[in-house]
Structure formats: C-alpha cells, structure tokens
C-alpha cells in the first residue's frame, strides 16, 4: 500500500518536548550542556546520526545573527503574544506578525532555520496593540484591529532592494515608512475579527468580518446599509486607501479571497441552510465592476453538518470543506459532483498541495491525515527503523504540555507552475502550534537513479522496507537501523503531482485508487497529464490476464475520455482521440482473444 514517509523538524530549544533518542524521524535543537546531563542514555548517538545527515544539533550563536538567542526570544514572544499572521514570501523566507506589532522574519535552508530577525519597529507606534489581521507586501503593510473601525496603512518610502532577496532580511526601520489611518464602516464598540485579502495586482483590498444577528445589533435610530455591511471593497492607488463599495453577505462567510486567475473576482464560502434547515455551504463569486462589488454566482453544496474549515485548490476548480461531524466534502467545479469521506479526526484545518494531487486535513489536537483529490486516504509515517504507516500522524505525543495546531501551510512559490516539466519541488509543510513551537514536516522524496529506458531523472514518492543499514558510534552500544526504502513503483520527480500519485498507485497495484484520481482530473486543462496517466493504467491492465474486474477497470479508464461527466472541448478531443483510439482497439482485441480462448 502506498504511504508517505516524513520527518518532523521542530524549531525549538525547549526541554519540554518529549522526543526520544530512537525517534530518528523527529528533531529539535539542543543546548550543548544537554549532552552532558540527559535522561536519554543514547542521545549522543542520535546526535551523530543527525549531523551525518547535515542536520544541526546545536545552533550557532555568532554575531550578528546570534541564531540561538534569537530563537529563544522568538519562543518567549510566542508564549506571551498572539501571532496574527504568518506569510511565506517565497520558499525561503517566512514573516510572522504578532498582535503587539512585532514582525519576525525567518530564513530557511531546507527544513532548518538559518536566520531569525525580530523587528520591533512598530511597537508603541500604532493606535492599538490588538491587531486582527495584516497584509504584508514589498511596498506597504495594511493592518486591521479588533476594536477599531480603522485600517492602518504603512507605506515604505524606500523600496526593498536586494540582489539576493531569499537570504537578506531587512528591518522596517531601514525602509523609511510612513503610517496613516483610514476610517471604515462596520460595528462600533464591539471586538470584531476583521480579516483582509488583496488581489494579485495589489490595487484592490477586501476587509470582511463575521455577521452578527439583528437582535444583537446595538440600538441606533437609523442603521444604514453601510453600517450593516460585513464586506468592504477598498482601492489602493498612489499610496492611499479608499473605500469603494460595501455589501452585506447573505450568509456568514467562512472564507473570502480574490481569485488567482481573475484579480477582480472575489470568491467566498458562506455557511447557509436549506429549506428544511439542513446545513449547506454557498460557494459564491462576486465581481468588482466600476468600483462596485456584487454577487454574480452562487453554488449551493449540501452538507451533513456545519462547515468549520475550507480550502480551494491552486487552480480553484475544487473546493474542500471540513465539517463538525468529521466529514470532508470535496466539490468539483468542472464535473459538478460532490465527494464525501469520513476523516479520522475533526477537520479544523485543510491544506491542498500546490500540485493539486493531495490534501492534508489537520485537527487542533495535533493530528494529521492525508487524502488524494479523489478522497482516497493515504497512510503516513515518520521515518523510523520499522515500517509502520498509519491513517493519522500524531504530533501531540511529542509535547509534555498539549499544544493546539493552529496553522499548516505548504512552503511553495506564490505562483506554482502547473507545467509537467516544472522543477519546483514542494516537500515542506509549515506547522505552527499555539504558543509554539514552529516547525516543518518534510516529505521524504529521495533522489533516485532512473533506469535507462526512462527519459527523466526524479524522485521516489513512497517507500517499502527492503533491508537495513546499521550505524553506531565507536564507543556506543546502541545501533540505529536506518531503513533502506525500495519503491515498488515508478520513479517520479518528487512533485507529488497527480501523475506521480497515479504511477505509484499502479505499482502498488491500487488500480481503483488510480482510476478514481484520473476521473477527478480535467482533460480540458490537464490534457497531457490525463493522457499520460490513462496510458499508464491501460498499459498495466492490458498486460494482465483479463478478468471481469480488470475489464471494468479498462472501461472506466477509457471512459474518462470517451464518456466524461462533462463534455470535452473540441480541441481536447482532436488532440488525443487518435492516440486513445489505439488503446481502445487494443482493449477490443484483448477482449476478442480472451473470448476465443474461453470458447
């Protein structure tokens, strides 16, 4: 069975973490003195193992970075202040903003911390120390507040200029910034979680907050529509903000953001109810035309219970919803079908891989589960001496004091290429726990030599135990049996793409899962990937002895092209029909030969 092999890297110096000396798939940082007096009898052996794999055991404290002291300061900050935003500028730099105005920049090298910069330039200079949300760009910062009907606009008068933006971290004081405030409509004298979103052109901003029931609305002689609105459209131009339009959504919004393909479309997910009070979710499209925002499309998705989390794929053609009864709902726009699966945990967090092949579901209790985009579950395990994949990964067992998982996000470029030849590899999942620690989950996509008959170099996706290598220090008595993992399937480029997953399913003989994933792919937008995947499935089945089950699988595979749920574009049909007709002919001859043999 296919499964994902991972490593957990926690960026923490605290001794309250419970990581054993035989947990070779889990790492944290240590002080030098901990090696001298430790409850773990073989911690030194694990140190040698980590350093042999280029993982730092202790952090350097050289000037000017003083990484060890900076990380200790960050961990103390997370204990005492609320982190309101974490944003990845690129694959190497993460920015954290705290409610007090402290801005922290993290620089990575692989799964390891390379630099921590703590910037207190804004502390004491804002009208409130209860920041609700923020937008961070290279030219400006926009802040919203929990108890203020104002937005803070911080304009940089000096452009961020760096020949190596991935490694250089500048403080705000070096950018000569100017602070201004703008009044916005909304509920007064009420603590409100005002959220922000910006489009890719950076000329329009959305500010939104939850709806409040009419009977809870503060008394006023006349409440204008503007005051009752919960979604504001603001324009940004020439260093200024301006409220352009406002609207009150029909239902309570769960998520609001601008479209990635259409910068003047706003996509929302709103929790609604049907005629019989059954729970539903509305996927709405708003358009910004002539400085006005209006709803142009609503898709109603039936649910078994109230939605508590949601996520869209990068291509925005699939919407995933997590519900109170632990069900996970996937709505496919191009097929207009709804899939459902019961998760092993409460889906408080959902994150889709940028390649669009898998999605991760997490609970606040520190659990993680993986599904592919057909909602087939995929087992997972941390690197260990023994093969023991499970349905979920438990993080809280490493904490002496339970810590809530509040964010998980793939570390990826802001614009992820969907082209098959792209070399962008996304194998790090950022994890943030309430009050700390921070860390990443590394998906082990190891480089492998490709056989001569294959045309590309790549990575193994999933692994099986074959044999073990032994490693120990010269004076130690304990040995670490490092597993050598042998793939049953195809070598991939480690991008966790749908093609990678389907090839792995084939070589683990999970044909139904491969066909289901192929059925979830859109021939009109992913024609080449669909053709490669279908060819692999059909070729594999045609090499097997024909049975009623394999016959049905061949029909289902070819049916993704010949009998799709939604009609294919004429250009798609013309491009692939001749090649696919050859597979259909081979299938017919396969049936004919089997029929003659039986008679």
Feature map (PLM): residue ranges:
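Non-catalytic amphipathic alpha-helical adaptor/oligomerization segments
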Residues: 485-599
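Eukaryote-biased detector of low-complexity, proline/serine/threonine-rich segments
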Residues: 418-430
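WD40-like beta-propeller blades
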Residues: 1-418, 441-472, 477-493, 497
């Amino acid at each position: 069975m296919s499964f994902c092999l991972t490593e957990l890297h926690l960026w923490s110096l605290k001794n309250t973490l419970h990581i054993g000396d035989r947990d070779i798939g889990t790492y944290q940082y240590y002080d030098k003195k901990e090696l001298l007096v430790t409850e773990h009898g073989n911690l030194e052996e694990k140190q040698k193992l980590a350093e042999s794999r280029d993982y730092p055991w202790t952090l350097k404290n050289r000037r000017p970075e003083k990484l060890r002291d900076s990380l200790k300061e960050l961990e103390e900050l997370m204990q005492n202040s609320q982190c309101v935003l974490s944003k990845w500028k690129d694959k190497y730099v993460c920015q954290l903003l705290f409610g007090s105005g402290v801005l922290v920049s993290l620089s990575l090298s692989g799964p390891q911390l390379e630099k921590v910069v703590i910037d207190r330039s804004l502390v004491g200079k804002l009208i409130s120390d209860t920041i609700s949300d923020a937008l961070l760009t290279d030219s400006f910062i926009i802040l919203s507040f929990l108890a203020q009907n104002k937005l803070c606009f911080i304009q940089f008068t000096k452009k961020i200029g760096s020949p190596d933006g991935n490694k250089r971290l500048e403080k705000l004081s070096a950018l000569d910034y100017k602070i201004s405030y703008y009044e916005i409509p909304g509920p007064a004298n009420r603590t409100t979680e005002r959220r922000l979103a910006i489009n890719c052109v950076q000329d329009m901003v959305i500010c939104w907050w939850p709806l409040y029931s009419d009977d809870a609305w503060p008394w006023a002689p006349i409440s204008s529509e503007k005051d009752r609105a919960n979604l504001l459209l603001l324009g940004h131009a020439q260093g200024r903000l301006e409220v352009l339009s406002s609207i009150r959504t029909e239902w309570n919004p769960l998520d609001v953001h601008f479209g990635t393909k259409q910068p003047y479309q706003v996509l929302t997910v709103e929790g609604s109810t049907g005629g019989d009070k059954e729970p539903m979710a509305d996927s709405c499209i708003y358009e910004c035309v002539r400085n006005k925002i209006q709803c142009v499309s609503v898709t109603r998705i039936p649910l078994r219970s109230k939605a508590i989390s949601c996520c869209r794929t990068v291509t925005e053609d699939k919407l995933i919803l997590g519900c109170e009864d632990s069900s996970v709902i996937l709505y496919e726009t191009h097929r207009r079908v709804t899939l459902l699966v019961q998760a092993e945990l409460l889906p408080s967090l959902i994150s889709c891989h940028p390649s669009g092949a898998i999605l991760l579901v997490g609970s606040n209790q520190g659990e993680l589960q993986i599904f592919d985009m057909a909602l087939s579950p995929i087992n997972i395990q941390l690197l260990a001496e023994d093969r023991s994949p499970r349905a979920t990964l438990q993080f809280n067992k490493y904490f002496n004091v339970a810590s809530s998982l509040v964010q998980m996000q793939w570390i990826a470029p802001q614009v992820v290429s969907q082209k098959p030849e792209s070399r962008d590899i996304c194998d790090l999942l950022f994890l943030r726990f309430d009050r700390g620690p921070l860390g990443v989950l590394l998906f082990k996509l190891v480089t492998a030599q490709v056989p001569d008959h294959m045309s590309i170099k790549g990575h193994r996706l999933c692994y099986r135990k074959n044999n073990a290598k032994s490693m120990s220090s010269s004076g130690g008595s304990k040995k670490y049996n490092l597993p050598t993992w042998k793939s049953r399937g195809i070598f991939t480029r480690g991008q966790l793409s749908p093609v990678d997953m389907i090839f792995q399913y084939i070589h683990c003989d999970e044909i139904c899962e491969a066909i289901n994933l192929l059925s979830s792919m859109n021939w009109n937008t992913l024609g080449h990937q669909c053709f490669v995947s279908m060819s692999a499935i059909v070729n594999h089945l045609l090499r097997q002895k024909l049975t009623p089950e394999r016959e049905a699988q061949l029909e289902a595979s070819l049916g993704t092209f010949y009998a799709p749920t939604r009609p294919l574009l004429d250009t798609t049909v013309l491009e692939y029909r001749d090649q696919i007709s050859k597979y259909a002919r081979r299938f017919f001859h396969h049936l004919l030969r089997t029929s003659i043999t039986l008679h």
